[in-house]
Every structure is written in C-alpha cells, then in structure tokens.
Amino acid sequence: KNFSAGPSKIPEIVLNQITEDIKDYKKSGYSILELSHRSEAFQEIVSDVKTKFVKLLNLPNDYDILFLQGGATFQNTFIPANKPSLKGNISFLLTGTWGRKTLKDFEIYYDHKITNYSLEENFSENIFENLQEVSNEYVYLTSNETIEGVQVRDFQLLNNKNLIIDMSSDICSYEFGWDNISYIFAGAQKNLGIPGVTV
C-alpha cells in the first residue's frame, strides 16, 4: 500500500501499459524512451494529453496548457521571472506552509513589495468575504495546504481578481469555474502521474 504524501500510487493498468510501451511503443519496433521530442509520435502524445486535460478541467478556449520540467516549487521562480509586472501588483492569501514558502521566493524577485494576508488562524472560506477590498490586480493562493489541512474550493468568493493558484495536491479532484482564474499549476505526482513534470 502506498499512502505517501508525495508520489501517489499508480494503477496497475497504467504500469502494465508503461511496461509495454517501454519495450515496444504501439508495435513500432522501438521504445517510447527512444522517441525524439520533435517526432510526430511524441507530438501526438502531447496533443492527446492536452485534449484530455481540456476535457477534465473544462478549460476555456482562451487558456493554454504547459508541461514543464521539475516539481511545482520551480513555479516559485518561473512565474515571477516571466511576469515582472506582478511586482507591487500581487497579494498573497496565506493559509499554510506551501503558500509561505512561495511568498519567500516571490519576495526575492519583487524586492519584498508584496501584500500578504494571513488566514491561518481559525480559517474558514467565509473569511474571503471580508477580502473584497484586496486592491492588487493579482491574488496568489494555495488551494490545499496539506500540512495544515486547509482547503479552498470556492474561488468565486474572491470576485474580480486574477487568481494564481497552486493546485498541486487537489487538481482534477473537483470542478471549479475559471471566471477569475489567470493561472494554475500542479506537480504531477500527487494526482496526475509520476514525479518530474509540472502542469
């Protein structure tokens, strides 16, 4: 039994398919590990996974999907490095360990010019109703703080905000609307697959 807080258990049917594809991918005579990332076969794999993600997440047409190397913590530098306009224009809603860790990394990029609201004491989603005055254009939060046991699902309680959400431990486990979401990310190993890739 695998009850690890990190990599999740992989279903036997998936392990069997992986084993088969490692030996001979779709009876092509070569292993899936030997595919060039520029090959048509590999591009078909990526396209198929993207199509399934769009369906799973009810993703609107004006969003795109990125498959990135490494774990979700890499997003702590990837996002600020690629979005310098967030400096002075992002607030953090802190509900636990992972949000605090991300805040520290963001502060390095943004010269500590980040507003943060600690919601860790006596947390409930009703607290969000008192945060309508958050003035910054972007708001960052962690949807499921696994160490503290705090989960946020009703993102609509934060109206008219561009949310950036770490959904590493609960992505694809419930439905949510995209009306006020700009960017979500998740390490694959909790709910989606094996370690080493972030969506």
Where are these regions (language model features)?
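Conserved N-terminal alpha-helix of the aminotransferase class I/II PLP-enzyme fold
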Residues: 28-78, 95-97, 105
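Short, charged, surface-exposed secondary-structure boundary motifs
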Residues: 101-102, 122-128, 172-176, 193-198
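N-terminal "arm"/small-domain region of PLP-dependent enzymes with the aminotransferase-like
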Residues: 1-36
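Active-site PLP attachment segment
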Residues: 181-199
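PLP-dependent aminotransferase-like
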Residues: 73-139
